[in-house]
Swiss-Prot record:
InterPro entries: Vma21. The gene is VMA21. It is found in: Endoplasmic reticulum membrane; Endoplasmic reticulum-Golgi intermediate compartment membrane; Cytoplasmic vesicle, COPII-coated vesicle membrane. The keyword Endoplasmic reticulum applies. This is Vacuolar ATPase assembly integral membrane protein VMA21. Keywords: Cytoplasmic vesicle, Endoplasmic reticulum, Membrane, Transmembrane, Transmembrane helix. The keyword Nucleotidyltransferase does not apply. The chain crosses the membrane at residues 40-60, 74-94. It comes from Chaetomium globosum (strain ATCC 6205 / CBS 148.51 / DSM 1962 / NBRC 6347 / NRRL 1970) (Soil fungus). The lineage of its organism: Eukaryota, Fungi, Dikarya, Ascomycota, Pezizomycotina. It is a multi-pass membrane protein.
């Protein structure tokens, strides 16, 4: 059986407590820092652009000039160049992760041990 709500005892929307998980109080500053550093976003955008431009550019630059119209070799070169960009991104990400670990100090500074 359903229970009856007593509307006179309930708080209205304006009377509810705003401190439970919502916005900070008026005198506090809110943290508007991005969750991911800007340098990481810029590296990701640069490698994304490189992943698009370098393989396609290498294909069209070499299909007629180097490989004399043989699109198989030019396509293989484009695939190799895409892998070069991907490996470059992996190296940059690993170097950044190692520098973050050296700056952080001990293993208990935010990241779990693996």
């Amino acid at each position: 059986m359903a229970t009856r709500r007593i509307i006179s005892q309930e708080k209205t929307l304006l009377e509810k407590d705003d401190s439970i998980g919502s916005s900070p109080a008026a005198d506090e500053k809110s943290n508007i820092a991005p969750a991911v550093p800007t340098s990481v976003i810029m590296k990701l955008l640069a490698f994304t652009l490189g992943m698009i431009v370098i393989p396609i550019g290498s294909y069209f630059a070499t299909v007629d000039s180097v490989f004399n119209g043989n699109s198989t070799y030019a396509g293989a070169l484009a695939a190799i160049m895409a892998n070069v960009v991907l490996i470059g991104y992996i190296f940059v990400a690993m170097a950044e992760d190692q520098s973050d670990q050296q700056e952080g100090g001990g293993p208990g500074d935010g990241k779990k041990d693996r």
